[in-house]
Amino acid sequence: MEMKWKIGSVEMENPFILAPMAGVTDLPFRMLCKEQGAGLLCTEMVSAKAISFHNKNTISLMQFDPSEHPVSMQIFGSEPDLMAEVAKSIEEQPFDILDINMGCPVPKVVNNGEGSALLKNPKLIREIVTQVSHAVKKPVTAKIRIGFEGYPVDPVEIAKIIEDSGAAAVAVHGRTRQQYYAGEADWDTIRRIKEAVSIPVIGNGDVDSPKKAEKLVRETGCDGVMIGRAVRGNPWIFREMNHYFTTGELLPRPSWEEIKEMILRHTRMQIELKGEFTGIREMRKHIAWYTAGMKHSAGLRRDSNLVSSYEELEKLLDFRG
């Protein structure tokens, strides 16, 4: 597989992409994934409407660092005019690609006609992608799911509409809205989409190891591999995938010392960005992910929920180690 590839004019060093995940892919975590070799980073999804209202919490999600390029910013919404207007207003922000969320399954998003609810309305998808791609010079992409139960969604046709409307790439999560993250991802539909369009196709769903990434590429022909849940607490997955695709060798999993140092570094970055009170609390979920499956991890998770300072966390990790 060719490692270097492009979305529009934006070149990536490798095909391994950090998926956009609410509450996960903030600036500190993106930077850690970049250091470990991610080819493209994606922000948390950001509401176009909230941007237009200059919502403080939303604006705080739009923080970038020069070291993280290339990075894709994901917005969600359902009003073509508003989304195009917002896209134009934020184009000067230092991101490289603008992605439109058409796959979020969360009820509060879907009930507003946003996220995966857009799959029910191909005409609206066409209007949104057309207006947004005309409003900005940066490449525009879309992330979709393969269906919405109860509606005759044809994901191949949706992908063609996205391409015809001016998108530079499409990311496909091989599950329907109702599946959320249950069951197996349907890679065959990703393959059919890849065969039907000429823009790059990014495969997403069930990729949790270098061998799974290789299998996805082999079975679908996809150009990019997007990793979501498997990267939580595991930014090393990008290092492992790059090494495997270039050498055929599997790297050993990180040692406890590596994990501990990553937790502490991640914590320092969170504190620097958000202050100690918020930073420590933000790290609680990450610590659970970093230590999942390890001996005494339940006790460590419990105790980490009680710490309120960096020093306390450092002592806890030294003691548990």
Where are the model-predicted features located?
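Active-site beta-loop-alpha junctions enriched in small/polar residues
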Residues: 21, 46-48, 76-78, 103-105, ...
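Hydrophobic faces of well-ordered beta-strands that scaffold small-molecule active sites
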Residues: 16-20, 41-43, 71-75, 98, ...
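Glycine-rich, positively charged N-terminal anion/phosphate-binding segment
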Residues: 2-6, 21-96
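Glycine- and other small-residue-rich loops at beta-strand/loop junctions that grip anionic moieties
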Residues: 19-22, 75, 117, 121, ...
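Alpha/beta enzyme core
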Residues: 35, 84-114, 123-199, 215
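Alpha/beta catalytic cores of nucleotide-metabolism and tRNA/nucleoside-modifying enzymes
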Residues: 1-4, 8, 12, 16, ...
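N-terminal small/glycine-rich loop or linker at the start of catalytic domains
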Residues: 3-17, 51-71, 104, 109-112, ...
